[in-house]
Amino acid sequence: MRTYNPNSLLPSQMQKCTCNSLHLAFDLCGGEA
């Protein structure tokens, strides 16, 4: 579900950082770990 939401824009960048730190959040990053 890749929708352009104001709530998903900012967290999107944070999620990328978290994706690198926590592999558990790789799912949020789109499975690109």
Swiss-Prot record:
It comes from the Bacteria. Encoded by the cryptic lambdoid prophage DLP12. To equivalent protein in phage 82. This is Uncharacterized protein YlcH. It comes from Escherichia coli (strain K12). The gene is ylcH.
